Amino acid sequence: MNLLDIIIIGIVQGISEWLPISSKTQVLISSHYLLNLPIAIAYSFGLFMEMGSIGSATIYFRKDIMSVFRDRKLLLYLAIITIITGLVGVPLYIISDKLLKNAYDPSIPMIILGIALIVDGLYIRYSRIKIRSFKDLSLKNIILIGIAQGLAALPGVSRSGMTVSTMLFLGIKPDDAFRYSYLAYIPAAVGAVGTTILFSKTNISYVISLIGIGGVLISVISAFIIGMLTIDLLLRFAKRRNIYIIDFTLGGIAIVVSVLTILI
């Protein structure tokens, strides 16, 4: 077991989870090359690694989480997003193994998402879209966000990219879009980890036999620490930028990383 490799995988998870570059795909690639994991097992490990990111979001947004439970409308909206995410995401997760075994290239959805973010930015830049709060959204808007998050169960599709871009398109101000995207992430990620353990128990056992429980814990803790720092930096960035600048930046990151993924 190479300790540096395990820490690197945790760092990859801690950074990529909060950017529109599909953390599960980045962990898939890094663990495939660093730990020599088969693709399907590396994908399951990528989802399992979200445990570290769940910790990051839960600790960072602990005050927001408490306020959610005091606000019935906000709690209802996040519950609906979670339910829709599960209805869309679980079937897609079940077929993900088959997709990865049939020459499915996860970098393609990242390129498409990057282009969509840039188009979204152009639309916002040249239209008179009304800025509103998350609680001003309609039920239809909330369902749309849930569908967007559920689609991220597919390899190469970024959860944060899908939800943040959808919220920006709906007129949510950037820092709120990031904040509520990350709050919606917590229950969805808990479900993703649970689904991974339920349907991919053999894959996770293989990883544990290879790097040990200690190795998995080190990787998860690395993801947790780096995730806290990344969330803070992104929220600071979002507060100081216009919506379309956020879209252009995230879209550019998604396209660059996906091209690098293809080259690797």
Curated annotation (Swiss-Prot):
The protein's Enzyme Commission number: 3.6.1.27
The protein's enzyme class: hydrolase
Location(s) in or outside the cell: Cell membrane
Residues in coiled coil: none
Alphabetized InterPro entries for the sequence: UppP
Molecular function GO terms recorded: undecaprenyl-diphosphatase activity
Key words, A-Z: Cell membrane, Hydrolase, Membrane, Transmembrane, Transmembrane helix
One annotated Gene Ontology cellular component of this protein: plasma membrane
Transmembrane segments: 34-54, 75-95, 104-124, 137-157, 180-200, 207-227, 243-263
Record field: catalytic activity: di-trans,octa-cis-undecaprenyl diphosphate + H2O = di-trans,octa-cis-undecaprenyl phosphate + phosphate + H(+)
Membrane topology, record value: Multi-pass membrane protein
Keyword Cell membrane in record: yes
Keyword Transmembrane applies: yes
Domain of life: Archaea
HAMAP family reported for this sequence: Undec_diphosphatase
Family under the similarity heading: Belongs to the UppP family.
Purpose: Catalyzes the dephosphorylation of undecaprenyl diphosphate (UPP).
NCBIfam families documented for this protein: PRK00281.3-5 (NF001398)
Full protein name: Undecaprenyl-diphosphatase
High-level lineage: Archaea, Thermoproteota, Thermoprotei, Sulfolobales, Sulfolobaceae
Gene: uppP
